[in-house]
Amino acid sequence: MRKFFVILMVALVVVLTASAVFAADSDPAKLNYYGYATAGALIGLGAAAGGGGAGMGQGLRGILEGSARNPGVTGKLMTLFIVGLALIESLVIYVLVFVLITFYANPFVK
């Protein structure tokens, strides 16, 4: 079932992107720009998501250890934890917004 799902997703991506690829101009400057933008987006989003996930995991670990040592402060710890998660997630969202701006800002329009 998993192999079928992977093949289905690859086929779907190929079908959805084929028309854009075949209709694109072959200007090397445009190809280089969008190639670098895509590579940067993949690296940036991967680093942001990985770092955010690691930070959230460490935060959860600290909350659980603090609650186990002193159950009376669990409410305060959870409040601080939710605020921390929101700040971590906002960094990932900022990277996503930057990537979307990079993709949709067309420097080749005259």
Curated annotation (Swiss-Prot):
Compartment annotation: Cell inner membrane
InterPro entries hit by this protein: ATP_synth_F0_csu, ATP_synth_F0_csu_DDCD_BS, ATP_synth_F0_csu_sf, ATPase_proteolipid_c-like_dom, F/V-ATP_Csub_sf
Marked site: Reversibly protonated during proton transport: E89
Gene Ontology terms: biological process: proton motive force-driven ATP synthesis
MF term (GO), any: proton-transporting ATP synthase activity, rotational mechanism
UniProt keywords, alphabetically: ATP synthesis, Cell inner membrane, Cell membrane, CF(0), Hydrogen ion transport, Ion transport, Lipid-binding, Membrane, Transmembrane, Transmembrane helix, Transport
Segments passing through the bilayer: 4-24, 37-57, 81-101
CDD domains listed in its UniProt record: ATP-synt_Fo_c
Keyword Nuclease: no
Gene3D superfamilies recorded: F1F0 ATP synthase subunit C
Gene: atpE
GO cellular component, one term: proton-transporting ATP synthase complex
Coiled-coil boundaries: none
Protein name: ATP synthase subunit c
Name of a matching Pfam family: ATP-synt_C
Species of origin: Thermodesulfovibrio yellowstonii (strain ATCC 51303 / DSM 11347 / YP87)
Function as written in the Swiss-Prot or TrEMBL entry: F(1)F(0) ATP synthase produces ATP from ADP in the presence of a proton or sodium gradient. F-type ATPases consist of two structural domains, F(1) containing the extramembraneous catalytic core and F(0) containing the membrane proton channel, linked together by a central stalk and a peripheral stalk. During catalysis, ATP synthesis in the catalytic domain of F(1) is coupled via a rotary mechanism of the central stalk subunits to proton translocation.
